[in-house]
């Protein structure tokens, strides 16, 4: 009766792929300046400057008289009114930088987003950045744990522990990521309302980095659920195949107990197939940690049973010798 780890390996592989995808998307969104995009309402330059508004010339005399006087100057007027007097320039903003188009010359002008944030919101922004960094760090740790579990395919004991730690790390990282995204959204809304007047957006919307961050969060939580499912299945299968054997048949010898649990092969009862599994209702349900260390307890129980059998065999031998004498 061997401990089969094939289906668990497949689920672990799926968890690792989802975790790697989430890690890449979250890193890209953190470094991007496309969380929010929109337009800024900027007055057009005066007549005579570069990229000026549409103007026309009207001659006027210097003394305010008739226009055919000898001394004249040219006054520029524009017919543009309302929103036509303004330019709507695109901008984009991220956790680190905010870039907007310039009127005077083609190109963008970038500023640090923390310089635009109101002083009351800067601590919240730093908290959001810290949570986002911890989110990525925990995802990286989870990926290393899942990768180690995949490489140790013949050691289900450590695989259980690695799956448990990876699942907990993924859940924590997902919660931190959700908090980081919501905090940054709050900071941006406050900056859009209370930030510098030359930066306040006329209209804004979510950019691709915002959606990428939430897709990353979704992949992280799906990976966590898959890892927990893998761990639960391995624990239940392990208890079903091995727990009853150790309690009902002490002749099942456990090999040397280490972190890596060896496969167990033994007969359960005479006349029953080796693959049979019985669930005794009198056996209490063990916790997760007890299930992981089941081999250790079984090995101690088996050792104690061997000592008792050896003592009984010795006494029986002595009594038979005395009877013969």
Curated annotation (Swiss-Prot):
Its main location: endoplasmic reticulum. Pfam families: GSG-1. Residues 306-317 have a biased composition (Basic and acidic residues). Residues 306-325 are annotated as: Disordered. GO terms for cellular component: endoplasmic reticulum; endoplasmic reticulum membrane; plasma membrane. It is found in: Endoplasmic reticulum membrane. It is a multi-pass membrane protein. The keyword DNA-binding does not apply. The chain crosses the membrane at residues 12-32, 127-147, 165-185, 208-228. Keywords: Endoplasmic reticulum, Membrane, Transmembrane, Transmembrane helix. The keyword Endoplasmic reticulum applies. GO terms for molecular function: RNA polymerase binding. InterPro entries: GSG-1 (IPR012478), PMP-22/EMP/MP20-like (IPR050579). Interacts with PAPOLB. Belongs to the GSG1 family. May cause the redistribution of PAPOLB from the cytosol to the endoplasmic reticulum. This is Germ cell-specific gene 1 protein. It comes from Rattus norvegicus. The lineage of its organism: Eukaryota, Metazoa, Chordata, Craniata, Vertebrata.
């Amino acid at each position: 009766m061997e401990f089969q780890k094939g289906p668990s390996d497949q689920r672990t592989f799926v968890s690792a792929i989802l975790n790697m995808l989430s890690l890449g998307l979250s890193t890209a969104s953190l470094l991007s300046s496309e969380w929010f995009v929109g337009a800024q309402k900027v007055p057009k330059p005066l007549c005579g400057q570069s990229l000026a508004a549409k103007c026309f010339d009207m001659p006027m005399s210097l003394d305010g008289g008739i226009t055919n006087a000898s001394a004249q100057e040219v006054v520029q007027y524009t017919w543009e009114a309302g929103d036509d007097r303004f330019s709507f320039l695109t901008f984009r903003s991220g956790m680190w930088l905010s870039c907007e188009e310039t009127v005077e010359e083609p190109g963008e002008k970038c500023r640090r987003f923390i310089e635009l944030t109101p002083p009351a919101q800067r601590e919240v922004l730093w908290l959001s950045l810290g949570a986002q960094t911890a989110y990525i760090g925990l995802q990286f740790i989870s990926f290393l744990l899942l990768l180690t579990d995949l490489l140790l395919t013949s050691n289900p004991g450590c695989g259980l522990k690695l799956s448990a730690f990876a699942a907990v790390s993924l859940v924590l990282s997902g919660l931190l990521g959700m908090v980081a995204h919501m905090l940054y959204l709050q900071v941006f809304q406050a900056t859009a309302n209370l930030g510098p007047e030359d930066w306040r957006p006329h209209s804004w919307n979510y950019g691709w980095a915002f959606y990428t961050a939430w897709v990353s969060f979704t992949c992280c939580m799906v990976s966590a659920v898959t890892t927990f499912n893998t761990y639960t299945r391995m624990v239940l299968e392990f208890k079903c195949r091995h727990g009853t054997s150790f309690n009902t048949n002490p002749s099942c010898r456990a090999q040397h107990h280490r972190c890596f649990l060896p496969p167990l092969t033994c007969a359960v009862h005479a006349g029953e197939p080796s693959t049979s599994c019985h669930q005794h209702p009198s056996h209490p349900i063990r916790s997760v940690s007890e299930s992981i260390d089941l081999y250790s307890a079984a090995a101690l129980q088996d050792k104690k049973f061997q000592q008792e059998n050896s003592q009984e065999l010795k006494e029986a031998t002595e009594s038979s010798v005395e009877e013969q004498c």
